[in-house]
Amino acid sequence: PNIERPLSYTAKNAYTKNYEPKITLAPGKTVSFDAYIVTGVPYYKNFASANVQDIAIKYLKCTAELPENPEEIKNASFSFVDDLTTKIKEGTVLSIGFSPDENNIFTKQNHFEIGWCGQNAMFARLMLEEYAENGDKHKLETAVSILDTWLKARLNNGLMYICFESIGSSSHISDMCNLGYAAAEYAKCFRIAESLGLSKPEWLDTAIGICSFMIKNYSDGCGFGKAVDALTGDFVDTKGTVGAFIIPALLETYKETKNKYT
């Protein structure tokens, strides 16, 4: 079942010939496989894969152990987010990561992305959840600052700059992955803020703006497309399935607006 065809996606925007491994048997030779059929009720809502993973570990007798417990891993993750946190004149953003320079010294990149690899909005939501659970005010303040800072990336047509450092550019391509993450996470963050007694209607407005643009420009031929010029609203790439990232955004925003025409 491990097949990619008709082409294989092997690098950024690069396709190569299909990946389709085969087993060749000599005359008279045989091969056998074992398979397991698993039934049951998911331990966690919408996460049945957790059952499959636990059963696989049990029956395949996996002996590997986590080097750290889940709490240590979570704390290490938030520590890394602290390292990514960048103060700029407009507020707070998260760097996309660290890369080696010409001397192979890892330095923080001055590249800030709302979703996809940068995940500014998602990390902000995780910090809000951590505050709600453990009362860490530093995480609350950082999350709110990140989300409020990114409001400056919004455009009048409902879209937004997906790279903060590109604000003010005469042309900016926004892909559906970033826009989908942005809208979905802003809707979730609005929901969490409401539960914490924080009034952040502009967060929900950001999600509504993106979703409204997508619904207005939906095409039966290419769905939501892949990428759009955020300033003109013209679609520059309509191929592929990246537009599917808009679906979670629509669902999360609908939960708050109850408006099927959001």
List the predicted regions and their residue ranges:
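Extended ligand-binding clefts on enzyme/binding-domain cores
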Residues: 68, 72-75, 149-152, 159, ...
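P-loop NTPase catalytic cores that bind/hydrolyze ATP
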Residues: 29-31, 118, 122-125
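Solvent-exposed loop and edge beta-strand segments that line ligand/cofactor-binding
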Residues: 13-24, 102-120, 166-181, 226-245
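Well-ordered alpha-helical scaffold segments within catalytic/enzyme domains
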Residues: 121-137, 181-199, 234, 244-261
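Low-complexity, Ser/Thr/Pro/Gly-enriched N-terminal "stalk/linker" regions
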Residues: 29, 42-114, 138, 142-145, ...
